Amino acid sequence: MERLEKRGQGLENFKKYNFEFYIIILFITILATFPFYRGNFHAGNDFAFNYARVMSTISALKDGQVIPQFDPNALSGFGYAWNEFYGPLPTYFISVIKFIVKSWSLSFSLFYSLCLFISGIFIFNFSSFLLKDHTNSKLFGLLAVALFTFSNSTYINLYYYANPSQPLALLFVILLFWGMNKMFNKRSFAAFLMVAFGAAGLPLSHTVTTICTLPFVLLYLLFLIIKKGNLKENIKIIGLGFLSVTSAIGLSAFFLFPLLENLKSGIYNVSNSDFSRSFGWNNIAYFQGKWEPLYKIEFSYYKFPSLLFVFIVLFIFIFSLINFKKTNAKYSLIFSCFSLVLVLMQLPIFPWKLFSIFTIVQDPARFSTLFGLFSALSLVLILPILLDKISGKTSYYLTIGLLVIFSILGFAEFRNRIQKGSQPLFASAQSLLNKTPFNYMENPDSIAIGEYLPQVIGSHNQPYEKTIQQFYKDKNVYGMRNQAMTYLSQRGKLPEGLAKSIQISDYSKKGSHVTFTATTGSKSASVEIPEIYYKGFIAFTKEGNKKIKLTSQISKNGFLEIKVPAKFSGKIYSYFAMSSATKYGVLLSLLTFVSLLIILITKTFIKRKLSKDK
């Protein structure tokens, strides 16, 4: 009898925590990511440099860097600092998975699956939260998961761009929207943390997705404020939200501070407006939609959602407008409106000249990564109103029927996209990662278009402006990168004295750690070390047990330059550590995280104590 009671209690807990639904979500995830486990990737430029970023993180950790930023092995030993410019969080997770499973292809596959599975759980709970007063809220949540998983957005993230940063960023988008809703429903610390970690995770994952999401977050915030309609309560919520966003900045400061430092420095290509214009980042001429998705079926296998689903969303928008007085219809209206705006963004009629600031994301299709989320939410939020006049039992079976139908149709279209859109581009991951041309140390694709190289590298044969004009004329986005690679191959890997009065000997290099002997005359002189310059290098000499810091800066050729004092003879040491901005950022991130953890533990302890007293 006691065993039966325990089994019954276990079954109740199983249902209470939605485990049966999570198993279905896991099955849906496996269906969407199965091609990866056959060892297939779309091995385009995005995958190449994201693979390189993971390798760089591991290389930087092996170099002894506490915050892995500079990869001393990249570019045949000249080094590259992906993680100072590009959200490093995906590389951390993939590196940990690789350490456990020992396989590159499996580590990427598991990462994609985990992102999609957790996103599914978030969407399920977010939808259920919005429909908490409805009987079939969990079934609708499951339908939202299926719609999202088999949407063009998931296809774009996983199989078109094949960029692991985007599915992780989308996970944080869902967490952020869910947290905002919880905060306006009830001012709780849980909602505070959801907004904080959601907002922090976005830039740490993918800057482009962050920029694409920002206008929709602001519009949704305005919607929630208007819907609340209570000025006093809104002020309190906005105050809490401001503190939450401040915490998000603190949590991500270890990345944001050095990023801003580099962008303001004017040293790198990415901070040059002419470079950005030439490569489409602030050039409206590059940023135009196309009509083809409306009448050429092959385009649907790439970026555009199916026309059938676009018409469904249009119907949802109209029906939500008609039933606007109902709460669910209000939510459905805003999400269907967002979805239709995302569709319009892909067409030439969208007035991008009014929103030219967003050209930094390079392509209107970048916004499409949000369509699956918004369209799925818009549909499941309007269904309870559509089924309102049907009896409970009939409504239940009809909801299951819709779940099955949309899942089958969605999966069929998703599979079709993969077969016709990406399968011809698939390459066997394991063999690809072992090929010499794909080696991240030498392969040019591993640094994308060279946007994070110093401007002087790649423009030695002619002035920078002329070089940029030529690449703009030729529409060659890889021109600067290729020219830089050519220069690096000619440069050689030995240090060079920048004055005749300095003698260099006993040069050795291991990772970013460099040691050499220098002798100067009556005047100080500088040495150029064959390492691409990024803020964070330190140089010093020793007097007994005391370290004497030396000045390190960028050389005229874009490398590390160390100033050696006059009348000096001895050993000089150099390695990549942390810039001032990184140090302050790390300190702030640690303080923020520890503070939030202490508050969480304290609140949990007090809550448990109060429940025991009752």
From Swiss-Prot:
The identity of this protein, by name, is: Uncharacterized protein llmg_1573
